[in-house]
A protein has these predicted regions:
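Charged, amphipathic alpha-helical linker segments immediately N-terminal to NTP-binding catalytic cores
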Residues: 1-27, 39
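A generic secondary-structure signal marking the coil-to-beta-strand transition
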Residues: 21, 34, 291-293
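Glycine-rich phosphate-binding loop of nucleotide-binding enzymes
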Residues: 24-108
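Glycine- and other small-residue-rich loops at beta-strand/loop junctions that grip anionic moieties
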Residues: 39, 119, 298
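Flexible, glycine/proline-enriched loop segments at strand-loop-helix junctions
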Residues: 53-56, 117, 133-134
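P-loop NTPase motor domains
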Residues: 92-98, 102, 122-306
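Conserved AAA+ ATPase "SRH/arginine-finger" region at the nucleotide-binding site
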Residues: 107-111, 120-124
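Conserved P-loop NTPase catalytic core
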Residues: 109-116, 130
Length: 306
């Protein structure tokens, strides 16, 4: 026996979801009058992937789902103000599609379009991500040396935090402000030192008339090491990272990376003190009047987008 499937039959198969607890993302192809709905709790509390070949409409599908979530109504047909969606947009695809419902944070923001500048504090990155933000290769031993230097600076500047953590709880991954200028300057200075007496740091040959400046990323100058074992003597404890530090300095001066290193009130002074903090940054990201916050990474330099 063959029966025609009715709308009521399709409702039993595809329907049954509470409208207040679900979102509509279109119509079921078998019946244009039947909404395709997704249980919102099941959807957002689980990992979800939208897959398809190039040009199949993945971005459009994501936009439809996000718009449906952003425009949900409560039982009295009012907007649900607590909706908060954080969208990481590597290719700048969603700002135009979702502009009515979103606040965009972008590198080199266009304020005429009400975009806000995207800032990502270097000191809040895990150490591995921090060190990978600079070009050049270093050995595992050299990396551990820099990790320890970062750790010590975070421990030192933690005293400026509102709630001071114990030293044992702090790691190089802890999101504690420290001065990247001072880190570079100290590492660079140690590599360049020469001594009048072999192995005697107190006999450094620092040129006092041409001292460096960490804020300007200007190195200290020392008398070059002598030839044939003559004074001045090289610093035998140097780690051999001067080439890496030169590349690091170039990256810090590169204005394309100001979103990472030039941070306004989130950039620490040489002691590690800041006037802003992460709580204000996060509040700025998710405390907007719009339900969707888009972090547009399309202008982030490709060198660090791997």
């Amino acid at each position: 026996e063959v029966h025609i499937v009715t709308k009521d039959d399709l409702e039993l198969i595809y329907g049954g979801l509470d409208k207040l607890k679900s979102i509509s993302v279109g119509q079921v192809s078998a019946s244009e009058n039947l909404q395709a709905r997704i249980d919102i709790d099941h959807f957002v509390n689980r990992h979800c992937a939208i897959l398809g070949s190039t040009g199949s409409g993945k971005s459009n599908t994501v936009s439809i789902i996000l718009e449906a979530i952003a425009t949900r109504k409560d039982k009295d047909n009012y907007d649900i103000k607590s909706t908060r969606i954080l969208l990481i947009d590597p290719h700048g695809e969603y700002g135009g599609i979702l502009k009515e419902y979103s606040q965009i944070f972008k590198v080199n923001a266009d304020t005429s379009k009400l975009e806000k500048e995207l800032l990502i504090p270097y000191w809040a990155l895990p150490f591995q991500e921090f060190i990978k933000s600079f070009p050049g290769k270093i050995s595992e031993k050299q990396e551990e040396y820099i990790r320890e230097e970062v750790l010590q600076r975070k421990i030192k500047s933690s005293k400026y935090l509102t709630v001071i953590p114990s030293e044992t709880a702090i790691t190089a991954d802890s999101p504690i402000p420290f001065s990247i200028n001072q880190l570079w300057f100290d590492l660079d200075d140690f590599e360049r030192q020469t001594f009048k007496e072999r192995g005697q740091p107190e006999t450094k040959t620092l040129n006092t008339s041409s001292q460096g400046n960490p804020n300007a990323l200007k190195s200290n100058k020392y008398t070059p090491a002598g030839n044939g074992g003559a004074s001045p003597f090289m610093n035998n404890s140097a780690q051999g990272i001067l080439g890496f530090l030169t590349l690091m300095r170039n990256r810090l001066l590169d204005q394309r990376f100001k979103f990472l290193y030039e941070l306004g009130n989130l950039k620490p002074d040489l002691e590690g003190k800041i006037t802003g903090d992460l709580d204000a940054l996060i509040e700025d990201w998710i405390g907007t009047e719009k339900p969707i916050t888009i972090l547009d990474l399309s202008s982030v330099p490709s060198e660090i987008m791997g």
